[in-house]
Structures are given as structure tokens and as C-alpha cells.
């Protein structure tokens, strides 16, 4: 979307985050139809379609969408949420045919200490390891900083 000469990038997470809503579960064909509508008719710039390593069925849905998106020239707009687990999420995404990893990381010392039981430095090393591996496999990487605003407030 262009607004006064500036481009605003629209990202939709319905196929990943929407499925976390109680009682919501999309079939693979529903996911495909939603992906096609969002990319072709709505024209979203980015579409996060799944979380890595959820299930074999989810991987098959990602493969189907990635295959279709590749044929339509949309593959660089199809993204999958992954985790700081070095090779596991990266390989799952790569094997699914997707080429963009949205890496979920911790954005606060509190989350590092209390959820991961790691220091900021240890988590940063995990992030680097995962990003370097993803790039070596040819994936583009976006980084999500979970709880960043609280982390910044608590320790700018």
C-alpha cells in the first residue's frame, strides 16, 4: 500500500495466529483458499502461514501453499514462524518449500531468565546460530522480539 509516497507493508497472520483462537482450525484446503485470497485478491505483502514443527499435516499444508506460491511468484511473500532451535525449525521450513523464517526470539531479560533459563548473551548466541544456519540454507530471516517493549522499559 502506498500512502503519500511511502510504502506501508501489510502482513497477515490469520493462518498462523488465527488458528490459535479457541475453536479455530483450518483444513489444508481452507488454508490454501485463504492464502490465495490474501495474496491475489487482497494483495497483502507478507503472509505468515504456520508455525514450524507443529505437525506433519501442517507441514503438508505449508508445502502445498509454497508450491502454489512459487508458481505464482509469491514465494518470497510466504513466511513461517520458527524458533531458536538451531537447525530444527530451519530444516522444517526449508523442507516445506518456504523460504522466509520469522524467528521468534525473546526481547526482554525477564523472558530470557524466566522462560528460557538463559542469559541475554546465551540467547543472543542461540539467535546468531539459528540465523547463520538459516542463511546458509538460503532462507531470508525476520526477527520477532517477544516482550520487547517491557524489556526496553525495564532495561533500556
Task: Pin down the residues of each PLM region.
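Short, well-ordered coil/turn segments that N-cap beta-strands
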Residues: 4-8, 43-45, 70-78, 97-99, ...
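Active-site mouth loops of central-metabolism enzymes
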Residues: 10-32, 77-86, 112-121, 144-156
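Non-cysteine beta-strand/loop elements that form the S-adenosyl-L-methionine
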Residues: 11-13, 98-109, 142
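Conserved, mostly hydrophobic/aromatic
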Residues: 18, 38, 101, 143
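Glycine-rich, proline-tolerant flexible connector loops at the mouths of alpha/beta enzymes
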Residues: 22, 43-69, 103-118, 145-153
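Alpha-helix-loop-beta-strand connector modules within alpha/beta enzyme cores
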Residues: 55-84, 122-139, 143
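Catalytic cores of alpha/beta
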Residues: 86-95
Amino acid at each position: 500500500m502506498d500512502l503519500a509516497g511511502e510504502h506501508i507493508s501489510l502482513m497477515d497472520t490469520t493462518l498462523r495466529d488465527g488458528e490459535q483462537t479457541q475453536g479455530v482450525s483450518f483444513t489444508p484446503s481452507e488454508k490454501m483458499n485463504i492464502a490465495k485470497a490474501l495474496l491475489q485478491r487482497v494483495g497483502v505483502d507478507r503472509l505468515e502461514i504456520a508455525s514450524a514443527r507443529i505437525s506433519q499435516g501442517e507441514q503438508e499444508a505449508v508445502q502445498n501453499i509454497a508450491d502454489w506460491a512459487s508458481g505464482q511468484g509469491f514465494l518470497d511473500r510466504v513466511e513461517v514462524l520458527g524458533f531458536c532451535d538451531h537447525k530444527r525449525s530451519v530444516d522444517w521450513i526449508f523442507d516445506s518449500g518456504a523460504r522466509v523464517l520469522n524467528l521468534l526470539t525473546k526481547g526482554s531479560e525477564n523472558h530470557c531468565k524466566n522462560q528460557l533459563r538463559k542469559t541475554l548473551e546465551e540467547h543472543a548466541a542461540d539467535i546468531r546460530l539459528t540465523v547463520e544456519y538459516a542463511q546458509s540454507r538460503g532462507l531470508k530471516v525476520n526477527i520477532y522480539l517477544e516482550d520487547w517493549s517491557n524489556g526496553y522499559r525495564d532495561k533500556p
